[in-house]
UniProtKB/Swiss-Prot annotation:
<keyword id="KW-1153">Inner capsid protein</keyword>
<protein>
    <recommendedName>
        <fullName>Outer capsid protein VP2</fullName>
    </recommendedName>
</protein>
<keyword id="KW-0167">Capsid protein</keyword>
<dbReference type="GO" id="GO:0075512">
    <property type="term" value="P:clathrin-dependent endocytosis of virus by host cell"/>
</dbReference>
<dbReference type="Pfam" id="PF00898">
    <property type="entry name" value="Orbi_VP2"/>
</dbReference>
<comment type="similarity">
    <text>Belongs to the orbivirus VP2 family.</text>
</comment>
<keyword id="KW-0945">Host-virus interaction</keyword>
<keyword id="KW-1160">Virus entry into host cell</keyword>
<keyword id="KW-1161">Viral attachment to host cell</keyword>
<dbReference type="GO" id="GO:0039625">
    <property type="term" value="C:viral inner capsid"/>
</dbReference>
<keyword id="KW-1162">Viral penetration into host cytoplasm</keyword>
<dbReference type="GO" id="GO:0019062">
    <property type="term" value="P:virion attachment to host cell"/>
</dbReference>
<dbReference type="GO" id="GO:0005198">
    <property type="term" value="F:structural molecule activity"/>
</dbReference>
<keyword id="KW-1164">Virus endocytosis by host</keyword>
<dbReference type="InterPro" id="IPR001742">
    <property type="entry name" value="Capsid_VP2_Orbivir"/>
</dbReference>
<keyword id="KW-1165">Clathrin-mediated endocytosis of virus by host</keyword>
<keyword id="KW-0946">Virion</keyword>
Length: 961
């Protein structure tokens, strides 16, 4: 057959009369537009794709369940490329067969980040599969439906410089957390406490006496508030305080639900059957999220929740020995308190240590918060009234903390509801040295002993460090046991200080602030300068994460933020605001703020963008971010190889070379940067490899193990592989410096989770001497990006140091580091592919709402079998984007095999049901009227000029080549 008819009919036409047609278009079933834009809020009701109506940032973590399966828009491109690459193999019987690179094909499909979770309808009359568009419904025979996918076009706004074909780049940057806003960690008096002034004294030399209720400045029952002078007296240690539980309005409904469960349990005479652990866990998780929302929770939250439910069941059993002790009769004990005490024991046992507000698991921190509303300071109450103490098996033990009360709770400034002028406590965090003038000869070693008498300096503990090195030499790199905080001295240890735990209310002295409060801490090995102090809220809470909540906010520039290694001192969120489904809405000010950074125009001009927008589209910001990141990374890493430049020339470090000449493809993926670093620095190539080649190279290196990993690295980068092979025979520092490049292969990707929540990998730190340090990665320190790595690489040794002889220990350290990196599987954590791979449609739909609106379409492919095998794409869409542009974008779906796409047909249906047809390539069209009995419809006749179409099982065959 060389001709195909596609009927287009309106309401009143009997569909069963079109039973013989494989494709039909119902132009009368539509979604009414609003304000000239498609009403995407109706998507959940349509047979289209699965996007939930919720906040956009929340939608990023939605697991699509309301669908009929996933499709890959590029599956034909991938399988055709595999088909093109098949090789002839002759077996022993001289039989010739063809084999494709099955491993590559399977990897490409698994690695695709644009899977579409489709919701389809089944037409009862015609038994066709129905796909809804805003202006029509497309129905297709099930034999042809396997190549069908949506083609969403966010309409570009010329004033914003949109390049929506780069939406995938924005999606990618959010996943590697390089398109984020930040807020520094902050604290406030716990809203679950009423802190009441019980007595006062004139100065700290006058002790508080038991029973003394002397008041000087305040009346009886005065509650301490941070904006009241009672707070100043408390901080000065002049007020003796009593803590009582209080229920914040935000979680009143949840506490009411918990009270109902508690009362049922009490009325049943403590029947364990009344304790529904799953129900309790859900309520407690809600409490935890409402009071301190992280938006992105730990990957193993589900497993921990199950353990917590089991602990609840065990603790409420009537014959549990600990429960029996809690139920011993004492005057001050109440059944309601016992309920929360048992929950807290279960939570503590689940986490194997004391639970704090900053606990990463919502159900556990929710248990603490809910218990505080009833008990006040929970752990001191458990110790004093119920004789329960933290277990010696807990890590950390923290028994000494039972004697004090803790009145400050961590708040997330993204969500904290407070008026401007409200007093809080928050961290300041900045680079100790953002830029420095140096020469290659003098290098940029880390100054571990900065000259600042007023600051607290974070220092290495030589004894602990020596022990770690000894253990490394004798037993190899212990990725779970070696920790950076263990080799730092306790004073100023920025990895262990925690204001929530260090500021405490003592029984005799009032509030005791930690010794580091309101003092600068310089942590030279992290190039960090920090201070925690009192401050004020500058702006009200806003859905825009870029709003600056304090008067001394943390940096927002994406490259600077990547340099802030100590991620525990700030929160981040995608720089996105608004709803997932909206016709029209504003975007975050993030993009506008980024456009004001020095060098913004120069970076974009490298990408061919001449007209610099004042309020850019996120796709423009994404191009800027990745281009600047590539230049920055190349600059700092090239300092670690031997250079032929003038050694005594002064230059600024680190810097971005806007004029660095690079060829090949535009960088749209961080894997391209990683591969280009090795190509450029070691192989002297200036050509950027394609995104699929780069991602596959990184995967190949990760999948290999042992000597095979070195072989694969050498296959791709012969010079770098040679340097690795020389590490075991190294005699000078420069010859082992190449080991610091290896983390690049394992620490960053948009579709990995680290195997453990807090592992460490070895890295050299260049100071007055060479140190090997545990570079900690995982959900508590790093976020599957290079945040934990970059700033260490800003340091590099002087020429004299790098050419100096290795001592007797350093070669042993280098050999163990190499051994670790050729065997590590740190990147093999579990990942929810359903969540990660299905967000491209979400980004496109959201982008439409902040730019020019949405244009939607459905595309499928017709196989041509004669005279040459090829494809014709057929698309049904609205008329909002010119057909020629839509056709060019269909070709972009075939970056690997576009030669097989020989024709394109675009049928555009407007809101009134009128349509136009566009065709190119081997296909032509004609529009006719068709009469069936007393009914009439339009029919689009497609002519394939000497080509024959067919092969219903095309995709099935390609997937089985």
């Amino acid at each position: 057959m060389d001709e195909l008819g596609i009927p287009i009919y309106k309401r009143g036409f009997p569909e069963h009369l079109l039973h013989g047609y494989e494709f039909t278009i119902d132009s009368s079933t539509k979604i009414q537009s609003v304000g000239g834009r498609h009403d995407v809020t109706k998507l959940p009701e349509m047979n289209a794709y699965d996007i939930k109506s919720e906040g956009m940032r929340t939608a990023l973590w939605y697991n699509p369940v309301r669908n009929d399966g996933f499709v890959l828009p590029r599956v034909l491109d991938i399988t055709l490329r595999g088909y093109d690459g098949k090789r002839a193999v002759i077996d022993s019987s001289r039989h010739k067969s063809f084999h494709t690179d099955e491993r590559w094909v399977q990897w490409m499909m698994k690695d695709s980040m644009d899977a579409q979770p489709l919701k389809v309808g089944l037409d009862d009359q015609t038994q066709k599969i129905a796909h809804s568009l805003h202006n029509c419904v497309v129905k297709i025979d099930s034999k042809k439906a396997d190549t069908m996918s949506y083609h969403i076009e966010p309409i570009e706004d010329s004033l914003k410089g949109c390049l929506h074909t780069r939406t995938m780049l924005w999606n990618h940057l959010v996943r590697v957390e390089m398109s984020h806003a930040a807020q520094e960690i902050a604290y406030a008096l716990k809203p679950t406490y009423d802190i009441v002034v019980h007595a006062e004294r004139r100065d700290r030399s006058q002790p508080f006496r038991p029973g003394d209720q002397t008041l000087i400045n305040f009346s009886r029952g005065q509650k301490v508030q941070m904006n009241h002078n009672s707070y100043e007296k408390m901080v000065e240690g002049l007020a003796h305080l009593v803590i009582r539980g209080k229920t914040p309005e935000l979680i009143r409904d949840e506490i009411t639900k918990l009270d109902e469960i508690c009362n049922r349990w009490i009325r049943s005479r403590y029947d364990p059957g009344e304790i529904k652990a799953y129900e309790l866990c859900k309520v407690l998780s809600t409490v935890g999220r409402k009071m301190l929302d992280q938006e992105k929770e730990p990957a193993d939250e589900a497993n921990l929740s199950i353990r917590f439910q089991e602990a609840i069941d065990n603790k409420f059993r009537q014959h549990d020995s600990e429960r029996l002790k809690i139920f011993e009769h004492r005057n001050q004990r109440r059944d309601e308190d016992r309920f929360y005490i048992l929950l807290m024991i279960a939570a503590s046992d689940t986490f194997n240590t004391r639970v704090w507000w900053s606990n990463p698991y919502p159900c556990l921190r929710g248990t603490l918060i809910a218990s505080e509303t009833k008990l006040g300071d929970v752990y001191s109450m458990m110790r004093l009234w119920y004789d329960w103490s933290v277990r010696p098996t807990y890590i950390p033990y923290e028994k000494s903390r039972e004697q004090e009360k803790y009145i400050y709770g961590r708040v997330n400034l993204f969500d904290y509801v407070a008026e401007p002028g409200t007093k809080i406590i928050h961290w300041e965090y900045k680079l100790n040295q953002q830029i420095k003038d140096i020469t290659y000869e003098q290098g940029n070693p880390c100054d571990l002993f900065p000259d600042d008498d007023e600051a607290i300096v974070t220092k290495f503990d030589d004894v602990a460090y020596g022990q770690m090195v000894n253990d490394l030499i004798n037993g190899g790199w212990d990725q779970e046991r070696f920790k950076m905080h263990k080799i730092l001295k306790s004073q100023g240890n920025v990895l262990t200080i925690d204001f929530e735990k260090d500021a405490k209310l003592t029984s005799n002295e009032g509030v005791a602030m930690p010794e580091y409060f309101d003092k600068w801490i310089i942590a030279p090995m992290f190039n960090a300068k920090l201070r925690i102090k009192h401050g004020e809220i500058a702006q009200r809470r806003n859905d825009d994460p870029m709003v600056k909540r304090t008067l001394s906010p943390i940096a927002f520039a994406p490259i600077v933020l990547q340099r802030l290694t100590l991620a525990r001192f700030y929160d981040i969120r995608p720089a996105i605001m608004g709803q997932a489904l909206s016709r029209q809405q504003g975007q975050s000010t993030y993009d506008e703020e980024i456009s004001k950074i020095e060098g913004y125009a120069e970076i974009l001009q490298r990408r061919g963008i001449v007209q610099i927008p004042k309020k850019p589209c996120p796709t423009v910001t994404a191009q800027y971010t990745l281009e600047r990141y590539a230049l920055f990374l190349i600059n700092i890493l090239e300092q670690h190889i031997i250079q032929s430049t003038d050694e005594d020339v002064m230059y600024s470090h680190p810097r971005v070379d806007y004029k660095l000449e690079v060829h090949g493809e535009n960088i749209i993926d961080i894997s391209q940067i990683v591969i280009f670093v090795f190509d450029f620095l070691f192989e002297r190539r200036r050509t950027v490899r394609g995104v699929y080649e780069s991602r596959y190279m990184v995967t190949r290196i990760r999948d290999a193990q042992g000597q095979n990993r070195i072989n694969v690295i050498t296959e791709f980068f012969p010079t770098f592989g040679y340097h690795l092979s020389r590490v075991k025979e190294a005699t000078i520092i420069q010859e082992i410096m190449y080991l610091n490049f290896l983390p690049l292969f394992f620490l960053v990707s948009d579709n990995i989770i680290y195997t453990h929540k807090q592992w460490s990998v070895p890295l050299f730190l260049y100071a007055h001497e060479l140190k090997v340090i545990p570079l900690e990665v995982g959900s508590y320190n790093d976020r599957c990006s290079l945040v934990s790595y970059i700033e260490y690489m800003v340091f590099f040794p002087s020429k004299a140091f790098r050419t100096s002889k290795l001592d007797e220990v350093q070669p042993k350290i280098a050999r163990e580091m190499l051994k670790y990196y050729i065997n590590t599987k740190i990147f093999e954590g579990g990942i929810n592919l359903n969540v990660v791979t299905t967000k491209q449609l979400l980004y496109e739909t959201y982008l439409a709402s902040i730019c020019g609106g949405l244009s939607d379409g459905i595309v499928w492919y017709l196989p041509i079998t004669h005279p040459n095998k090829c494809l014709v794409a057929i698309e049904v869409s609205d008329e909002r984007v010119p057909a020629s542009i839509r056709a060019s974008h269909i070709k972009l779906r075939f970056p690997l095999s576009v030669k097989h796409l020989k024709g394109i047909v675009i049928i555009q249906v407007d809101e009134e049901g009128k349509f136009t047809v566009y065709s190119e390539g081997i296909v032509s069209h004609r529009v006719c009227k068709k009469n069936l009995l007393k009914y009439m419809c339009d029919i689009v006749l497609l002519k394939f000029s000497g080509h024959v179409f067919g092969n219903d099982e095309m995709l099935t065959k390609l997937l089985n080549v």
